[in-house]
């Protein structure tokens, strides 16, 4: 399921460590033994610590070794003023289980896992954000099936994973087509199962992001519903979020701040080193062809870094409302409770110093 790696600041080497047993329990779904994170102090007006004491460590729940790779290739990993351990997971729900068990401190995720964290009573505020092309997600069509419009989704078997950005994309697609969840067959799967399920015809439709879109299209007879149809179903937002207990701890909250800054600088490095990123990550790590790697990088567009402000909170609330309208949330939640806006100052500084942008440039 995952491979842990521990890094020490200033060292280029990597050592493999046994992940905490509690993380294993988390990924197996043993959730009943852990308590929800509950704020013990109001951090909104508490100054964000900046001093990272020696010996501070963060456990980062990564996906596809992506954050670990971008930090390493950009040179930011060696600059981190704390020890970091990476554990690789598949999908936001598995990461939430690790958070619940206290087996991870911070993680990169899509825009939906933080919503389900709120609904589950887990206090895991967003501390950083990035924006990529909304066209990066595709509705993939299985071989031998026909679907060229969103109206064609009616009656189809659609891969569906609660607590993921793909969940919101499916619900928005149905709403845009004037369909309800009862008009289709939602096949509940793990994200890791989506690609094989659609290319083998176990489902008719699956929402995929790269590199799985490119992998799918290698299968004869597969296709995607055109972007002109799917515009607006995926926001392209991704986040860094951390357990509240971590953001309330002076040492770890300062370490998270350093990670947020490195996150911005590392992805801005991708913006200016696209070919190198394509080769080192997608070709060497994800094992796609050089041609496919270039296609993937182009599809994601330029990374930008939104302010952590009311505008972003409102965007997140709109996603919450879309999921709630479909009856897919157990209770009403407020996006405002899922952010730690203190980290915006660090985002703003890192954007200015690295030459990055807060918003995509208009074409």
Segments predicted by a language model, with ranges:
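Pocket-lining segment of extracytoplasmic ligand-binding domains
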Residues: 112, 192-285
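Conserved C-terminal helix/tail region of periplasmic/extracytoplasmic solute-binding proteins
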Residues: 321-363
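Solvent-exposed, polar/charged alpha-helical surfaces in well-ordered, non-transmembrane soluble domains
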Residues: 69, 97, 101, 115, ...
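Bacterial N-terminal signal peptides that target proteins for export
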Residues: 2-20
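Secondary-structure end/capping motifs
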Residues: 249-330
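C-terminal motif of bacterial Sec signal peptides marking the signal peptidase cleavage site
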Residues: 28-32
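Short, glycine-/small- and polar/acidic-enriched structural segments
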Residues: 39-180, 185-188, 204, 210, ...
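Bacterial signal peptide processing site
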Residues: 34-37
């Amino acid at each position: 399921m995952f491979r842990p790696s521990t890094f020490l600041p200033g060292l280029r080497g990597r050592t493999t460590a046994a992940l905490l047993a509690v993380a294993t329990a988390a990924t197996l779904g043993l959730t009943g033994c852990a308590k929800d994170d509950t704020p013990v102090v109001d951090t909104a007006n508490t100054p964000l610590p900046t001093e990272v004491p020696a010996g501070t460590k963060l456990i980062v729940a990564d996906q596809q070794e992506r954050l670990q790779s971008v930090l390493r290739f950009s040179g930011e990993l060696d600059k981190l003023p704390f020890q970091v351990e990476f554990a690789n997971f598949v999908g936001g729900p598995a990461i939430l289980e690790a958070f619940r068990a206290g087996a991870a401190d911070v993680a990169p995720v899509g825009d939906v896992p933080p919503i389900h964290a709120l609904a589950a009573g887990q206090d895991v505020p967003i501390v950083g954000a990035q924006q990529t092309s909304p066209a990066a997600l595709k509705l993939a069509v299985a071989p031998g099936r026909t679907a060229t419009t969103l109206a064609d989704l009616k009656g189809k078997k659609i891969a569906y994973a609660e607590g993921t950005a793909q969940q919101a994309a499916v619900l928005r697609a149905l709403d845009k087509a004037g369909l309800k969840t009862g008009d289709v067959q939602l096949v509940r799967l793990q994200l890791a199962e989506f690609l094989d399920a659609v290319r083998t015809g176990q489902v008719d439709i699956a929402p995929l992001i790269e590199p799985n879109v490119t992998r799918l299209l290698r299968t004869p007879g597969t296709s995607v519903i055109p972007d002109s149809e799917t515009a607006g179903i995926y926001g392209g937002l991704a986040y860094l979020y951390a357990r509240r207990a971590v953001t309330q701890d002076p040492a770890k909250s300062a370490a998270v701040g350093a990670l947020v800054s490195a996150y911005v600088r590392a992805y801005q490095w991708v913006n200016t080193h696209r070919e190198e990123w394509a080769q080192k990550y997608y070709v060497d790590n994800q094992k796609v062809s050089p041609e496919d790697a270039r296609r993937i990088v182009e599809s994601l567009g330029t990374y930008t870094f939104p302010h952590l402000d009311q505008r972003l909170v409102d965007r997140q609330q709109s996603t919450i409302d879309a999921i709630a309208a479909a009856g897919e949330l157990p209770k009403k939640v407020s996006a405002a409770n899922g952010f730690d806006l203190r980290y915006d100052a660090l985002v703003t500084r890192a954007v200015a110093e690295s030459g990055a942008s807060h918003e995509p440039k208009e074409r």
